[in-house]
Amino acid sequence: MVRRLHRKAGQSLIGRQWPAVELVFGCYFDEDLPLLMQMRNTHPDLQLNHALPYGAIIHDRGVQFVVFSRHATEMRLLLYDDVAQREPSEVVYFDARTDRWGDIWSVFVPGIGAGQLYHFQASGPFDPGRGLRFDPNARLIDPFAKALAGNFQPATDGVIRPPKCVVVDDYFDWQGDRHLRHDLSESVIYELHVRGFTNHHSSQSRKPGTYLGVIDKIPYLKSLGVTAVELMPVHEFPTNNFDGTTDPRRNYWGYDPLAFFAPHRGYAADSRPGAQVQEFKEMVKALHSAGIEVILDVVFNHTCEGNERGPVLSFKGLENPVYYMLENDRRYYRNYSGCGNTVNGNHPIVREMIFHCLRHWVHNYHVDGFRFDLASILSRDRSGNLVPNPPLVEAIGEDPLLADTKIIAEAWDAAGAYQVGSFGDDRWAEWNGHYRDDVRRYWRGDPGMRGKLATRLAGSADLYQA
């Protein structure tokens, strides 16, 4: 049975007075919370004077849920007791008078904590001509969700039911683990796919296809002289169809993301909600203990929501024209990614989300670097034009909290941009596509490649000035 809860001003969700809380003035970000919790051995006090940070924030007495939507007319929080549940156990209505701060919706739910399952649901105009695609029936993934649970459920009634978001406690005993800070010029980076690297019986992994399985491969990586592993996408991505049917070949590599803050649940040995968070951290800690850094292949250029014919899963149903680049005819999506849509990375709201996401992975997961897929998209303004000194690229390179982090660009996109040799400033490294292509052509036996091979082996002076 669905219980519809509505908090009136001055009342709790269940009709009692709000518990006494200490009002803490100022602002903190979600990546600061683990340190705050360790310092105080508790969860931070409920912040009633502002709506930040985003996502699901655990407090001693409950959880605060914060989401951005400019054009929503109504926001709801759907709470579930079980991963397999098709309908929510509780529906919490945000009060636009007391739970909305500008374009931020924020509500506190007492009596729940880590492990709680949830979706957002937003009502608003369905007006594709203005780029608005609100669907009051859609179950929406929190853009800041730190873990997902379950799979897409069969849409027998026409309603897509995506994996549920999980409220996550960020605490983990790192036992003094820190970033390794290997010099990039001395790094040997091994690109691997978590499942593909460990799933075959020949890998001799005790937990094949998982983060924990990677730990069993550390002696092999050390024997190769590897100093860093670059993990192909581990941000949450769908592996079954949106209608709940399965396809083992769908999105195997993971380059069709669903939730940027959440490690992929399919790589966890333990299927319980949120277990992937702990297992990912165990993997990073073990790799660091062996002197091996962890670099993530991140796909901030598009999502699995696709174009105007794609499903409403998260961003589309919260604020479509902010999160995505749209054509002048705003019914349609600009497609610089070749995957149906393009994330609007230099919009201030989206830029902030990406910025917080990078900090989240560095500070909560201790990752050592990022390889940015189709990074030239990050150089496009909100109209899709390539611009000098793009705000997002500059912000990533200048962030003092990412100063020890390796940042590597795949400096092109699917719409003709090619910035190898000129992406960002000296803070950015690049994948050298010319090196890859010329070495392949040489080994294939193409004529006239000896000189080009020499140029690449000598450092590509035609691209990079000493």
Regions found by a protein language model. Name each.
Residues 28-60, 87-91, 100-104, 108-191, ...:
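The feature marks proteins involved in alpha-glucan
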Residues 61-65:
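Structural beta-strand segments of beta-rich domains
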Residues 69-74:
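Short proline/glycine-enriched turn/loop motifs at strand-loop junctions of beta-rich domains
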Residues 76-78:
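Beta-strand signatures of extracellular beta-sandwich domains
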Residues 122-177, 239-256, 310-336, 446-466:
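Core domains of carbohydrate- and sulfate-ester-processing enzymes
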Residues 145-146, 366, 379-382, 387-466:
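Conserved alpha/beta catalytic core and glycan-binding cleft of carbohydrate-active enzymes
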Residues 193-212, 216-367, 371-398, 417:
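Substrate-binding/active-site clefts of carbohydrate-active enzymes
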